[in-house]
Amino acid sequence: MEIDKELAPQDRTVTVATVLPTVPGPSPFTIKQPFQSEVLFAGTKDAEASLTIANIDSVSTLTTFYRHASLESLWVTIHPTLQAPAFPTTVGVCWVPANSPVTPTQITKTYGGQIFCIGGAINTLSPLIVKCPLEMMNPRVKDSIQYLDSPKLLISITAQPTAPPASTCIITVSGTLSMHSPLITDTST
């Protein structure tokens, strides 16, 4: 049985994204702003942390008055303190997308996860830097919609059984934000 007519006529609108023209006009003015935040004082006890970068206070404060914000660069630094030589501390770090089910206990089972011994007689006392592979996750931390795959940092700390009274290392997150499209808000208060 053949059907000679179209039962439900279809609109012939072109909807392929590469064919649609871009909105005319200049690119938005972009502001680049560095940030750094202390996220953990470690070494006095065992600890685990899972930090979504968009939720870090310094990042959310900087992006408050902008509609769009992306990470240009991002890294974690482990800074040994004067307690480190006498009280070595094991620090594990791993960058994953925020929606990843990976937990801090799975750092060595995850691509890019690293474990460091901070302090001790023969270990490094220099700061250690681990860069976030932004090309492997979404660098957008603020937009008109919420993304679930922006960077998240997993941290695992194993302290000495006889831990010191003060931290053996300080962990900071640093980077550069690119922000544009200021929000129209009342700034008179």
UniProtKB/Swiss-Prot annotation:
What are the entry keywords? Capsid protein, T=3 icosahedral capsid protein, Virion
GO terms of molecular function: structural molecule activity
InterPro entries given in the database record: Tymo_coat, Viral_coat
Instruction: Identify the Gene3D superfamilies for this entry.
Output: 2.60.120.20
The residues forming the signal peptide are none
Q: Where in the cell is it found?
A: Virion
UniProt keyword DNA damage present: no
A single GO cellular-component term from the record reads:
T=3 icosahedral viral capsid
Q: Which family would the database say this protein is a member of?
A: Belongs to the tymoviruses capsid protein family.
Q: What does this protein do?
A: Self-assembles to form a T=3 icosahedral capsid composed of 180 copies of the capsid protein. The capsid encapsulates the single-stranded RNA genome. A pentameric unit may be lost during decapsidation.
Q: What is this protein called?
A: Capsid protein
* The organism of origin for this protein: Turnip yellow mosaic virus (isolate Australia)
